[in-house]
Amino acid sequence: MMLVLTTLIFSFSASIAYAQSGCSVSDPLDALKAFKDGAGTFLLQKSTDPQARDCLKGTPNGNRDGNTLPVTMTYKDDSKWVSLNWMFTLEGANIVATLEGKRKQRGELVYDVQSHDCHITKLSSGVYQQWQSNGSADDKDIKCCDEKFKELTSGIDYTKPQEKGCETSAK
């Protein structure tokens, strides 16, 4: 009982500290805006999936058609780069990623900063992911995203896929 009470107090305190930190969020949550309408590459910075792909990044590879966006997901498998073409359907906060019309992965946008340089998704499996725009990103927004990820994943281990020998880029 004491552990539950302590956890509740900690969570409440973290929420107050987060609210007072001056973080501006995108409201309402819109996955298409979080993906910058299909402009630019996003890197998976943090994931609660212990088997998250090393160096995972998503890059739009064609024109957006309404709320559908073709995306190439690239990751490092040992020393070899692998690229797979996915089709993302983005509607409100909902995200459905389909690989070659067969495999589907569902998720939900749970946090997005105002600049759309960083966002957090929660997959239907319960995995949390923090994605960051490749290139110039506002340090304050990234800090806000880091704080929110920490709040959402309190007590859950996570990996940092971009710290797995990603220095050499995929061709």
UniProtKB/Swiss-Prot annotation:
The N-terminus is blocked. Expressed in salivary glands. It comes from the Eukaryota. It is found in: Secreted. Residues 1-15 form the signal peptide. GO terms for molecular function: toxin activity. InterPro entries: Calycin. Disulfide bonds join 23-144, 55-166, 118-145. Keywords: Disulfide bond, Hemostasis impairing toxin, Platelet aggregation inhibiting toxin, Secreted, Signal, Toxin. GO terms for cellular component: extracellular region. Belongs to the calycin superfamily. Lipocalin family. Tick salivary platelet aggregation inhibitor that plays an important part in the anti-hemostatic strategy of ticks. Acts by scavenging thromboxane A2 (TXA2), a potent inducer of platelet aggregation and blood vessel constriction. As a consequence, is a specific inhibitor of collagen-induced platelet aggregation. In addition, it also acts as a potent inhibitor of TXA2-mediated vasoconstriction. Has also been found to bind leukotriene B4 (LTB4) (which also derives from arachidonic acid, as TXA2) with affinities in the nanomolar range. It does not interact with complement protein C5. This is Moubatin.
